[in-house]
């Protein structure tokens, strides 16, 4: 019997193909794992309550219940709540992106006594769970007469967010010092340097920051639930609490359909801005 | 810091832009928040209700605006928010609460308004028309069920009763329970074991679910059914070691151990019985009359659904408690009490009460509204007959004012799973529950004073 062996080039090509096949298989499996819950949510939104509770599990609906989406949309003022969510998310994302960039610039490019300690405190505040501050937060805003208004999101936006400050700080610290020095020689002050030189350079981080902040607010349940009345509340609160039957128990298929519609805006924003988002995360030194 | 002053116009421009952005964002909202279309607008007094979305539909709120000339503002019920509002001195005017477990808790802390003067002058909520279930909202400083009224139940069920699916009984050849004579808890569990269906180690049909409206109130109710009281006379301690409480606890642990129904160690992914029962995957469901609201919407399910009397313990009294009695109470510091009372009367005696009564989601709490309960279909007549007979056995199982039921339930959920899995004896469990719960009750009593 004659043993034939592949020429070295062909063997290498086969090895590359096999490696690629293994890689793609793993990637597809991981993607499936991550998309699984969302896929299940979509399927749940297309089933009847009986099918949703069936055992053995009905993976695919016998009859697709498209009307669940229409019902979920009409059962509550979906657009009204979505508008409220959008307004809050835009206010907060815009303001917090600007304020965090400003603070991040300070930490990256300016020197002052206690800067390191202040930065440590700032980072330390990221470890503080939101639940701890829930009660005093309500009391403060109630004393200021800001309960059931959107002013808390304006104030939170103007106060910068530690994680975003860190993101900007990392990015600004990586920009060449020559840029700053040239501007100083030309007579620019630090406000001008920030506004005219550093900020225009930071579009990737700006878009990453905006997306992150927008997603935080769009998905936040606790703050709107605590501070807003039902009529002024957001889609996150409405989706979580409004699809109930006469006994207050959740109607899971309508809730699932509403949840799918609820995440669509976030997915669209991410799809449109994903290049900037990825670039922002990679150029900030955070991966 | 190196000092390089910026050019004044740029600084101003930057500050103007930053401030402008902030102000524009806020001003765009008119300094306020945007409202979804609840249909509530216009002038008049405003009453704030802390309720759940299913308590009042936007249409009913709109109707209230028209009928009462009162603007109703709703906030979602949330205990953290309620405590924060009470602490801040600006509570809602009316708050949702579970009569069985909340009434004494808030009354003992002196944050609830006594409503007797309001009831005395009401022509809509007459005292002789109130169902005895409303006594859950009475508290005399020591015992629930006596003394001033602090609230009222919107509807109720006798929550130890259970529904059963005749098709699943037929399939396994188990006899239907009597419509008039209760089974014993032991018989109920035997039936559940015969009715459960499993395939490849998975439970495809639960034999029966028996979890009450919460573990703390369920065990209070089960102990009463065994002829005892879970709490000491002054409600400052639990005693799971008494023969009656031990019997009740032992039965519930047996129920969990044999895995015939959902429990902490075998949770139902649907989180409550409704969808599972609706999918013909639960032969018996420990829900009271209120589950009829769901069953009535599914004609095929209604045909095979029957309501049965609350089980009894061998040698125990025949009682049938209400573990909920959810309704509204008025905080003592409510700002708009008279307008709130008008809404209270409307909610419990007018359009919303009538809508609830005819919906089948609970028994009306005004006797005069009983005639509105669904009784057109044959199965509805059967359900009503059983329910009316059961009302004779209604009783109040008093709950402690010194702890929130969620706190006691949390302790139970932490300790009990070991006993449910057979890793701890019921006696040990009883001792550990006594120790942990009494510690919490002690702290609660210190707060009340």
Set out the residue ranges of the language-model regions.
Chain B
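Extracytoplasmic/periplasmic substrate-recognition and gating elements
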Residues: 66, 87, 250, 254-260, ...
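Short, solvent-exposed loop/beta-turn-alpha elements that line the ligand-binding surface or hinge
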Residues: 116-131, 178-181, 199-200, 204-209, ...
